Amino acid sequence: MKKYLITSPELYTQEPQSFEAILRRILTEHTPEYAVYRDKQNPKYKELAKIFVQVCREFAGLCCLLHSDAALACELGADGVHLTSAQLEAIPHAKHSGLFVILSTHTDEEITHAIALGADAVTFSPIFPSPNKGEPKGVEALCEVVAKNPIKVFALGGIVEPWHVEAIAKSGAYGFASIRFFVD
């Protein structure tokens, strides 16, 4: 099962040197196959995105993504972009630009649209209780989504314990995505 690391400014900081050190340590310790730089409010987003891509390049086989900004992902040489569910219509442009595309989804309808528009993978969330993310969908709903949709599905939301990962593995999901699971 694939591991997908999502950064958070609260846990990785917005200070370039600290960000780089924390990122490198976590990538070394957890060896995820996918990683996305996500910081919706940072005025230094481009500066830290550049550091993120450079550090990710040190880890062979790591698929490096930026959150929401396909143009910047292309400019900095990232492998892909993680789009929000509100950015569904941006999938074709991102794919045309040669990017690997993951879309955040919360419903079957969003997954169906993501597939139709050519997304490579989706996150489906929240699976477990997660701060400010609404009612958890649960592992049973994840199993249903995985069984009926021909796309890579990453479980997301509230994944903080090894037993969460074990439950997701049994669902047949392609992988799991998390912020807090990877932080000590």
Give names to the regions the model predicted.
Residues 5-11, 84-93, 121-136, 158-184:
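Glycine-rich phosphate-binding active-site loops on the catalytic face of alpha/beta enzymes
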